[in-house]
Amino acid sequence: MAKVITMGEIMLRLSTPNNEKFIQADEFDVCYGGGEANVAVSLANYGHMSEFVTAVPDNEIGECAVAALRKYNVGTKHIARCGERLGIYFLESGSAMRPSKVVYDRAHSSISTATEADFDFTAIFEGAD
């Protein structure tokens, strides 16, 4: 099987439960993901070696995001711990004729403030297909 590297932003998704609107919700469901992270998880589920490269804050929320990847056997050894916050997006799931709504809060997230110096690209791509 292939060794595939993906790089992008992992985000914290806060979703309203039970198709509630934002204004109706008293709580949110939590999930971690993002386009490239989701690809890494899918590849791992198909038996490939996948490694996700990103930056997360060096705090408990950052570690929760990393743990969410690890539980699907996605490699996390090249995730930088830097910056101050994880990007967040809020999801109001649509219902019947009402469309879903998404609100992004990702300004100044860890990956957006990371620099090339935060990553060892030679090590990251070693053995990648």
Predicted regions and their residues:
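Structural alpha-helical scaffold elements that stabilize or flank donor/cofactor-binding regions
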Residues: A123-I124
